Amino acid sequence: MQCFSFIKTMMILFNLLIFLCGAALLAVGIWVSIDGASFLKIFGPLSSSAMQFVNVGYFLIAAGVVVFALGFLGCYGAKTESKCALMTFFFILLLIFIAEVAAAVVALVYTTMAEHFLTLLVVPAIKKDYGSQEDFTQVWNTTMKGLKCCGFTNYTDFEDSPYLKENHAFPPFCCNDNITNTANDTCTKQKAEDQKVEGCFNQLLYDIRTNAVTVGGVAAGIGGLELAAMIVSMYLYCNLQ
């Protein structure tokens, strides 16, 4: 009985933490959606890399709602000893765990396919909005400066972009010796072609692979917590009268 009470208390505390994390994600998501520029000024390249591939604001809001609801469900189920709530909590967490494993496998096995898919989404956006949409341009500038890269694939992503049409040059990040913007020389097509600055997608993959141990450790830690939460919820479910 003491063991059951201890596990029940730990379940409540753990899910209270999850509940608060969900609320924080929701708040940050709303912040990014309303004022992405100030978010970038604070977090810089740490946040901007992912903003090329997904709408981070909406993504964080969606993730926050799920985590918020999951934390509430876990707290409610443990506190009221509701078998229905505990089983619902278990199955939602199981689905999330399976989705994460599937996403990891797809990312590892189908990297080339993912790159092609993202290229179809991101490159047209660069050609359309870089140089005309302030927030979009700032996100890319922060990313290219932080990762020392150029475009999604390379400098050709900026062809026909508003920036190129207005400045008759490519972004300085596409020319290694002009990144600091101290030189008078503009980043011409010939210069960008000669410099061969890596695209941000490949650079991001390189950074992830370089820090594979850290990334893997974080992923394993999250997976371990999810498994532990599922085991505890099932233990409580099975020991309730």
UniProtKB/Swiss-Prot annotation:
What SUPFAM superfamilies does the database record attribute to this sequence? Answer: Tetraspanin
State the InterPro entries in the record. Answer: Tetraspanin/Peripherin, Tetraspanin_animals, Tetraspanin_CS, Tetraspanin_EC2_sf
Glycosylated residues: list them.
N141, N154, N178, N184
Q: Give me the Cytoplasmic side stretches, as residue ranges.
A: 1-11, 77-88, 238-241
Gene3D superfamilies for the chain: Tetraspanin
* Stretch forming the signal peptide: none
Q: PROSITE patterns, per this entry?
A: TM4_1
Name any one Pfam family assigned in the record: Tetraspanin
GO (cellular component) term, any one: vesicle
Q: Where in the cell is it found?
A: Lysosome membrane
In what way does this protein cross or attach to the membrane? Multi-pass membrane protein
> Which biological process terms from the Gene Ontology are attached to this UniProt entry?
protein stabilization
Q: Which UniProt keywords are present, listed alphabetically?
A: Glycoprotein, Lysosome, Membrane, Transmembrane, Transmembrane helix
Q: Which residues lie on this side of the membrane: Extracellular?
A: 35-53, 112-214
Q: Where are the transmembrane segments?
A: 12-34, 54-76, 89-111, 215-237
Q: What does this protein do?
A: Structural component of specialized membrane microdomains known as tetraspanin-enriched microdomains (TERMs), which act as platforms for receptor clustering and signaling. Participates thereby in diverse biological functions such as cell signal transduction, adhesion, migration and protein trafficking. Regulates neuronal differentiation in response to NGF by facilitating NGF-mediated activation of NTRK1/TRKA receptor tyrosine kinase and subsequent downstream signaling pathways. Plays a role in the inhibition of TNFalpha-induced apoptosis.
Q: What does the sequence similarity comment in the record state about its family?
A: Belongs to the tetraspanin (TM4SF) family.
**Quaternary structure?**
Interacts with SLC19A2. Interacts with NTRK1/TRKA.
Q: Which PANTHER family match?
A: TETRASPANIN, TETRASPANIN-1
Q: What is this protein called?
A: Tetraspanin-1
